[in-house]
């Protein structure tokens, strides 16, 4: 999967821009505030229906516009398709794929799988289990068609269950929901575990490339005691759940644990090593996606020179090239990227005050 045409309108400081990206590495350079990161953000928005920089989507709409518009042609090995999105300041969003209206944003994610490596993405190891669950669930969503519906049902029933707990309902009332909840929770957990097991097989070799002197162990924890049946746990834990007003254990507490020896990776590794570990995780995900469903991710890498030294920039760019994926990389100066490449980039773009120019 790659974008061979991208149209951006009223997105942050980009009034209007047309790009024809290359299949491989696309270098986007310009000064801070020029709009180069906004191009990455626009691609992400097109694939996810939201920004990776702000939780308030209205903020990405140009101040002089009532809506933003994004459009792309996508090329795969089999065919070409078109995807379009309009986001209004009112909050309304319109999405079309090949001219047909799309109601679920999950369809965007399925159509356009995107991996992001930004200064903020390194929070994967620091911001607690939620970001690591999201990492697992991205892969589980793409690898198993059963996952999304099961995950939606877990969230729906968990919300109802927690409300019953806050209302101090008897367990007999909660038990009615638990039968369905347990079924979906166990399916979500099974798919997550299978995904992490498959990821681990690829990840070991990639980590050895990035961190050859470090033995990183990656494991999945399901969110409750592995020796206890979930149905039994929910029943015995009812008094505790009632006291807290929410379900203490379950798939909503799952985590991806990364350890070096007896220590969590974030305590054992330097900041530079942690950046490399996150890069390894993202690359492994992209490679596994290709292996499982024969679909390539699109990689968005923001401000690479400030995050990695020259040696590790070269290693990351080579690993990205090995995935065969389309890659968009930003930098202030193009030499910081080009000098780390074995072969020239597919395309280069210069951004200044929101205007995009292709460099021949």
UniProtKB/Swiss-Prot annotation:
GO terms for cellular component: cytoplasm. Pfam families: SMC_N (PF02463). ATP binds at residues 30-37. GO terms for biological process: DNA replication; DNA synthesis involved in DNA repair; double-strand break repair; SOS response. Keywords: ATP-binding, Cytoplasm, DNA damage, DNA repair, DNA replication, DNA-binding, Nucleotide-binding, SOS response. It is found in: Cytoplasm. Coiled coil: none annotated. GO terms for molecular function: ATP binding; single-stranded DNA binding. InterPro entries: DNA-binding_RecF (IPR001238), DNA-binding_RecF_CS (IPR018078), P-loop_NTPase (IPR027417), RecF/RecN/SMC_N (IPR003395), RecF_2 (IPR042174). NCBIfam families: recf. The RecF protein is involved in DNA metabolism; it is required for DNA replication and normal SOS inducibility. RecF binds preferentially to single-stranded, linear DNA. It also seems to bind ATP. Belongs to the RecF family. This is DNA replication and repair protein RecF. The gene is recF.
């Amino acid at each position: 999967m790659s974008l061979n045409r991208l149209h951006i309108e009223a997105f942050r400081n980009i009034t209007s821009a047309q790009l024809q990206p290359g299949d491989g590495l696309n270098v986007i350079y310009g000064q801070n505030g020029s709009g180069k990161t906004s191009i990455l953000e626009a691609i992400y928005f097109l694939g996810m229906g939201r920004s990776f920089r702000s939780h308030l989507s209205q903020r990405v709409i140009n101040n002089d516009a009532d809506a933003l518009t994004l459009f792309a042609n996508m090329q795969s090995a089999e065919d070409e398709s078109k995807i379009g999105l309009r986001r209004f300041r009112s909050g309304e969003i319109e999405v079309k794929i090949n001219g047909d209206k799309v109601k679920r944003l999950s369809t965007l994610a399925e159509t356009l799988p995107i991996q992001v490596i930004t200064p903020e993405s390194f929070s994967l190891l620091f911001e607690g289990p939620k970001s690591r669950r999201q990492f697992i669930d991205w892969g589980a969503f793409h690898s198993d068609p059963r996952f999304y519906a099961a995950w939606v049902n877990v969230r729906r029933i968990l919300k109802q269950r927690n409300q019953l707990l806050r209302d101090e309902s008897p367990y007999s009332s909660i038990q009615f929901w638990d039968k369905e909840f347990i079924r979906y929770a166990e399916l979500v957990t099974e798919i997550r575990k299978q995904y992490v097991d498959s990821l681990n097989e690829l990840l070991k070799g990639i980590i050895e490339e990035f961190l050859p002197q470090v033995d990183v162990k990656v494991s999945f924890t399901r969110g409750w005691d592995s020796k206890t049946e979930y149905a039994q746990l929910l029943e015995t834990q009812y008094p505790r759940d009632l006291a807290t007003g929410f379900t203490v254990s379950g798939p909503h507490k799952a985590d991806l644990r990364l350890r070096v020896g007896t220590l969590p990776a974030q305590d054992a590794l330097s900041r530079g090593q942690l950046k490399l570990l996150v890069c390894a995780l993202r690359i492994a995900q992209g490679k596994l996606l290709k292996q499982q469903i024969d679909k390539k991710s699109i990689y968005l890498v923001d401000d690479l020179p400030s995050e990695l030294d020259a040696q590790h920039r070269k290693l990351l760019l080579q690993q990205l090239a090995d995935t065969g994926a389309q890659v968009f990389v930003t930098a202030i100066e193009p030499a910081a990227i080009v000098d780390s490449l074995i072969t020239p980039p597919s395309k280069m773009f210069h951004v200044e005050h929101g205007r995009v120019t292709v460099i021949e």
